[in-house]
Amino acid sequence: MIRHLITTKDFTKDEIEDLFDDAQKFLNEPTPHLLKNKLIITIFFENSTRTRSSFEVAAKRLGAEVVSLDVSKSSTKKGETLFDTAANLNAMEPHAIVVRHKSAGVPYILSKYVSCSLINGGDGAHAHPTQALLDLFTLKQHFKAVEGKKIAIVGDIKNSRVANSNIELLQRFGMKVILVAPPHFLPKTDLPISYDLHAIINEVDAIMSLRTQTERHKYPIYASLRDYGNDFCITKDLIKDKDLIILHPGPVHRNIDISDEVLTDPRCKVLEQVKNGVAVRMAVLKKLIMHG
């Protein structure tokens, strides 16, 4: 049966633990070319540095062929519908397609038009499942057991697909989540919230800082990003010598999301997230293509 990864809910807890076992092996051992002669197509309708390159490196390390569709030169710019694009890509008989789109729901809809696994590389402010998976993997790598650990998600939560996916996944694995942001960056939620980062810093084991999604704002909310950073930047003065770790999905707005000093602090796991992202995406590709 063909399976897709549209949201984190598409995999059970047991399946995710198995994924993480594979990801750890990929980090520790030479990678066998498990996907030799397999074809993976990436099509990103929104800009991406980390996610796209991470999927492509993951596929190539597994021995797969990768075709990246340049949307700026594709037929969608000439009036071809998304569904025609999906049908044409599907006719090339790929084994998986990775899609990113600015509109929520597009990967789910496209999955109905293809006969291979479709992976959501991010859709609007809806979901980014592989980012949440690599974030959880990074947290488990550090804490071993994450159940009962408390994480603050800080920043533009309302517009963040990363936050949406992490809120679902981290809670499913027993983590406590608190949302920290100015009121206009918070979604309607039953989760605990705070408008003051300093007020909750002593009660959390981890902080996930998010980028301000200015491209998704209908009008300027802050006079400048610097004003936002004055209240919500993760600084050395904030974290002092506390026993916690810091995550960020990237790209980081330096000295607005996280200070230069904290980015070089060993408690900041941003580069580990990038490294882990390749291994986790390798595990996802292996699972969907080889096992369904």
Curated annotation (Swiss-Prot):
The record, for SUPFAM superfamilies, names: Aspartate/ornithine carbamoyltransferase
Q: Which organism is it from?
A: Nitratiruptor sp. (strain SB155-2)
Please verify whether the record's keywords include Transferase: yes
The UniProt family comment states: Belongs to the aspartate/ornithine carbamoyltransferase superfamily. ATCase family.
Q: How does it assemble?
A: Heterododecamer (2C3:3R2) of six catalytic PyrB chains organized as two trimers (C3), and six regulatory PyrI chains organized as three dimers (R2).
Which pathway does it operate in? Pyrimidine metabolism; UMP biosynthesis via de novo pathway; (S)-dihydroorotate from bicarbonate: step 2/3
For binding carbamoyl phosphate, which residues are annotated in this chain's numbering? Answer: R50, T51, R100, H128, Q131, G250, P251
| Key words of the record | Pyrimidine biosynthesis, Transferase
Q: Name the job this protein performs.
A: Catalyzes the condensation of carbamoyl phosphate and aspartate to form carbamoyl aspartate and inorganic phosphate, the committed step in the de novo pyrimidine nucleotide biosynthesis pathway.
User: Has the keyword Transferase been applied to this entry?
Assistant: yes
Q: Which GO terms describe its cellular component?
A: cytosol
This protein is called: Aspartate carbamoyltransferase catalytic subunit
E.C. no: 2.1.3.2
